C-alpha cells in the first residue's frame, strides 16, 4: 500500500483508491485506468473505462469478479453478448476469454477482485486471446 493511502486514512487496513496514483490496469489489453492493491492472496482494483472503450479479447488464469458501481459494461463471453448494469456483479471463470467495454451511454466504473494464485506461480495475469 502506498504511504499516501496509509497517511490519508490513518489505518493500514483501510484502502482509499481515490488517493492512489491512477495507471493502466491491463496495459495494452484494455483502456481501463485506476488504482489497485495486492493483498497476500487477492488483487483488488477500482477501474474506470471511458464510454465506448474497453478491452481486447483476453483471459486471466484466475477467477475474477467485477462489481459495476457506475455506468454499464457490454460483455462478450462464452459465445454470448450481455450488459452488466450498475449494481450487478460480473463473474469471469478462470481462463474464460472475454471482452468488456463501457457502453456508449457513459463511463463505467467497477471494482475488480481476482485471486493471485497464478501470479504467485510466476504466470502472466492477463493473456490476449
Where are these regions (language model features)?
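A short, N-terminal "cap"/entry segment at the start of jelly-roll beta-barrel domains
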Residues: 1-41, 46, 125-129
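Ligand-binding loop in jelly-roll beta-barrel domains
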Residues: 94-120
Amino acid at each position: 500500500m502506498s504511504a499516501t493511502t496509509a497517511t490519508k486514512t490513518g489505518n493500514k487496513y483501510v484502502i482509499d483508491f481515490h488517493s492512489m496514483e491512477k495507471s493502466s490496469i491491463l496495459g495494452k489489453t484494455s483502456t481501463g485506468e485506476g488504482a489497485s492493491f495486492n493483498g497476500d492472496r487477492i488483487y483488488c482494483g477500482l477501474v474506470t473505462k471511458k464510454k465506448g472503450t474497453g478491452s481486447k479479447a483476453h483471459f486471466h488464469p484466475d477467477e475474477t469478479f467485477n462489481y459495476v458501481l457506475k455506468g454499464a459494461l457490454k460483455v462478450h463471453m462464452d459465445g454470448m453478448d450481455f450488459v452488466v448494469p450498475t449494481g450487478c456483479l460480473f463473474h469471469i471463470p478462470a481462463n474464460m476469454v472475454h471482452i468488456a467495454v463501457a457502453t456508449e451511454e457513459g463511463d463505467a466504473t467497477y471494482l475488480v477482485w481476482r485471486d493471485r494464485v497464478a501470479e504467485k506461480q510466476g504466470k502472466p495475469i492477463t493473456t490476449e486471446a
